[in-house]
């Protein structure tokens, strides 16, 4: 069965289209009007091993918040839909990823229970047109709409670009492990029988 999803989200603030294939090859393309955020979404696809297409038109004349938030919500929804009943998945994943001086640890549980723990040094500023304070909100939005538990911990880093990018790469690698199919898992990996 194909583990894919196509999610379209329309509000008065944005129009988002996400296409996701969990069993892809890491082909990723993002066009949101926020170049650094495009780069981050492409990191999720590439390092998650997902085929991912992101197309967002948002009210950038105000700022990037709605565009970024709605894209994250739609991505989380696509992740949840592509996982289906979660039969045969590994469920858990973790990764520690360096990017020069930055080091980030992420862990994910595809539990069906949304919970986000995000620990980073206070980063207030812009990377291009990307507001660094949105990073936590992106992961909170993905977590809520995907219904997953996600921990992201920045262990070190000074350069804002490196700190944010290492977070996306680390989350992607953790998700890659969690969504992977495991031939030893019969059914859903939970003693409850459902995730």
Curated annotation (Swiss-Prot):
Native species: Parafrankia sp. (strain EAN1pec)
Catalytic activity: D-erythro-1-(imidazol-4-yl)glycerol 3-phosphate = 3-(imidazol-4-yl)-2-oxopropyl phosphate + H2O
Biological process per Gene Ontology, one example term: L-histidine biosynthetic process
Name of the protein in question: Imidazoleglycerol-phosphate dehydratase
Keywords tagged on the record: Amino-acid biosynthesis, Cytoplasm, Histidine biosynthesis, Lyase
HAMAP family: HisB
Family (UniProt): Belongs to the imidazoleglycerol-phosphate dehydratase family.
InterPro entries linked: IGPD_sf, ImidazoleglycerolP_deHydtase, ImidazoleglycerP_deHydtase_CS, Ribosomal_Su5_D2-typ_SF
Any one Pfam family match given in the protein's UniProt record, by short name: IGPD
GO molecular function terms noted in the UniProt entry: imidazoleglycerol-phosphate dehydratase activity
EC number: 4.2.1.19
Listed pathway(s): Amino-acid biosynthesis; L-histidine biosynthesis; L-histidine from 5-phospho-alpha-D-ribose 1-diphosphate: step 6/9
Main subcellular location of this protein, as a coarse class: cytoplasm
